[in-house]
Amino acid sequence: MKPINIQDQFLNQIRKDNTFVTVFLLNGFQLRGQVKGFDNFTVLLETEGKQQLIYKHAISTFAPQKNVQLELE
């Protein structure tokens, strides 16, 4: 049985749904936008047509504007 990767499922679902998210960084700063892509180390966030590449180790929390449906089985 393949292990479930909740992080990748979550990020992929908010990317596919174009869900707006608030990204809280470890330094307390907040970024708002849409996830356009991600890999093992970074998340590409788009805000008002501008892109920001954020390193995952700097992220504390993702807060989507709506609930995200995941398949955990």
From Swiss-Prot:
Sorted UniProt keywords: RNA-binding, Stress response
Residue ranges occupied by any Sm domain in the UniProt entry: 8-68
**SUPFAM superfamilies associated with the record:** Sm-like ribonucleoproteins
Q: Which GO terms describe its molecular function?
A: RNA binding
InterPro entries, sorted: Hfq (IPR005001), LSM_dom_sf (IPR010920), Sm (IPR047575)
**GO cellular component terms listed in the entry, alphabetical order:** cytosol
Q: State if RNA-binding is listed as a keyword.
A: yes
Oligomeric and partner information:
Homohexamer.
- Which protein are we looking at? RNA-binding protein Hfq
